[in-house]
Amino acid sequence: MKFLGKLILWLLVALLLVIIGAWFLLQTHWGARQASAWLSNGTGWQVSFDEMEHDFSSPLHVQLRNVTFGREGKPATLVAKTVDIGFSTRQFSDPLHADEIVLNDGTLNLSPHSADLPFAADRLMLRNMAFNSPETGWALSAQRVTGGVSPWTPEAGNVLGKTAQIQMSAGSMTLNGVEASNVLIQGKIDQGEVTLSTLGADVARGTLTGNAKRSADGSWRVDNLQLNEIRLQSPASLAEFFAPLTTVPSLQIGRLDITDARLQGPDWAVTDLDLSLRNLTLSHGGWQSEDGTLSMNASEFIYGSLHFFDPILNAEFSPQGIALRQFTSRWEGGMVRTSGNWLRAGNALVLDDTAFAGLEYTLPANWKQLWMTPLPAWLQSLTLK
């Protein structure tokens, strides 16, 4: 029995020495190469790192240096200077679900094809990372990203998972061609519904703040959005500029405020624009509202041959149509003023009060052709009282 006991003891000591030796070997360049090859072999993924570090003061954390990870034969999904992985007792039941993954100083490229990653974490932390998400409908690229996702359970078609809390900041970001800097995002994802409880950024030399919610079907509800001192030049015509609003199934605007904006396109421009819009829903090329309002004024508005100075517009929206409470502007050396109603039934515009004073207007050479041009679909009749 003594011999058997000593044999078991020596076997345990030998096993412990092998484990300790393997542990130290893994922290060498040779060991890192061997571990990378073992992790990549037959998995469909390509993993490489130069060195693994472990500190007994943090026994449940392992740090990998100069990490590259991605599908075999595809561009790398992750390139990072360091990756810190925190473990917990959960590894006994779910070895690929970490307590925490911290990515430092690198680039994370996520697409629907790479989203079905073989691991997850209670927390994913990004520190000074670049983030690219092509082919997802968002066309997102961000630099100097710091923040986190909790929990992080990626799956095919859902880069961040179906349920998560999000808090991130970015030094710069491009989303669907729109550039921004000093971006702050806080919110959550819940079964395809995205809630942005805090949204802030510097955009087009101005600032953007607000909150919004995106439904699983792609509809948006903007509870509050403020744009201040925007300076934007666009290559798009006015119709093309607003075209993205028609691509979503529904856009519900609770409150939109624009202050001191200057916008310019190839055949249109507006300067010193102040706008306040309340309770309006855009859907399928139309609009709906129960008690919406619009107040707008500017120093100058240009659209084609039309050139208005100091235009002021106040209107109210209802299921029956639009009540034009006030429209005044300086135009062609004079003044124009009107009020009335646009009626949804029959697409009829009824002007109650219209006045022109001091105009100096020359008809264009093709005025007869313009006169014979059919009215747009939303304006089937015009009545002056």
Question: How would you describe each model-predicted region?
Answer:
Residues 1-17:
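N-terminal Sec-pathway targeting helices
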Residues 19-112, 175-180:
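Terminal hydrophobic membrane-targeting helix
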Residues 45, 74-76, 136, 204-206, ...:
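Short acidic/polar mixed-charge low-complexity motifs
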Residues 61, 66-68, 123-130, 160-264, ...:
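Small-residue helix/turn framework positions
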Residues 87-91, 151-153, 281:
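Outer-membrane beta-barrel proteins
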Residues 91, 111-116, 212, 340:
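Short, T/G/N/S-enriched strand-turn elements that build extracellular solenoid repeat scaffolds
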Residues 107-153, 164:
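Non-cytosolic head/periplasmic domains of membrane-anchored proteins
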Residues 132-145, 264-283:
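Short, solvent-exposed loop/hinge segments that bridge or flank secondary-structure elements
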